[in-house]
């Protein structure tokens, strides 16, 4: 169970008007019903590492957490120290590995990780749906790392217990504004902005929310 949470932790994730740190977001998660976070990178590329940072922070706070990599990139595998050739979603989909064998542990933290191992999987595929359902039963929180250029696949990942996090590693808010604008064009307005530790700047704000 979660533990050692400050009494003044925010009651819910601060949506929209402020960029939060991973620690602030974790404190908020303890008091919310959110069980899944969809992570998008504000840097314009795929496979931002915000999900790795957040997963480690969640695990340190005493919650069980798993990161599902749907980017089809190798950055998350490299950052978490998972050996090349380790099985992932591709092997699971091809019946080459059972679910238990595609779940790996972050070598630098306590978060578990499932890799894409191949082309980026479709979020609404039966295999991804099965993995997400199993993880929802087994973990306090599931993080889904998604390529920001595949926002059209977001609806299949969203429900009343899912939040969208735009994680930034850039030194300016331009990336936040770009991703947020694209999401709003799809009718998605309820966003959380998280600044990754490597480039955190005090007082930086997220783009204004529409009235």
Map each language-model feature to its residues.
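Acidic-aromatic/histidine active-site loop/patch
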Residues: 1-35, 87, 94, 170-173, ...
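P-loop/Walker-type NTP enzyme "switch/lid" segment
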Residues: 6-16, 27-49, 66-140, 148
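Short, highly selective alpha-helical patches that border small-molecule cofactor pockets
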Residues: 47-51, 55, 176-180
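Short, charged low-complexity intrinsically disordered segments located at boundaries
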Residues: 53-55, 120-123, 164
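Post-Walker A helix-loop "phosphate-sensing" segment adjacent to the P-loop in P-loop NTPases
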Residues: 56-68
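A generic structural signal for alpha->beta connector loops
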Residues: 62-64, 110, 187-191
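Conserved catalytic-core segment of NTP-binding enzymes
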Residues: 124-211
């Amino acid at each position: 169970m979660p533990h050692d949470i400050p009494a003044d932790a925010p009651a819910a994730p601060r949506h929209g008007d402020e960029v939060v740190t991973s620690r602030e977001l974790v404190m908020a998660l303890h008091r919310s019903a959110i069980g899944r976070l969809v992570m998008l990178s504000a840097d314009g590329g795929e496979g931002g590492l915000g999900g790795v940072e957040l997963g480690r922070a969640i695990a340190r706070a005493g919650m069980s957490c798993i990161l599902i990599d749907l980017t089809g990139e190798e950055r998350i595998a490299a950052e978490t120290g998972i050996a090349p050739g380790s099985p992932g979603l591709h092997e699971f989909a091809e019946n080459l590995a059972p679910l238990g064998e595609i779940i790996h542990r972050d070598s630098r933290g306590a978060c578990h990780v499932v890799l894409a191992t191949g082309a980026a999987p479709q979020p609404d595929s039966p295999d991804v749906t099965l993995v997400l359902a199993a993880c929802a039963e087994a973990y306090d929180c599931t993080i889904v790392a998604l390529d920001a250029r595949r926002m059209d696949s977001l609806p299949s990942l969203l429900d009343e217990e899912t939040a969208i996090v735009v994680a930034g590693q850039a030194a300016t808010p331009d990336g936040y504004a770009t991703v947020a604008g694209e999401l709003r064009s799809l009718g998605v307005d309820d966003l959380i902005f998280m600044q990754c530790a490597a480039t955190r700047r005090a007082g930086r704000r997220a783009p204004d929310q529409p009235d």
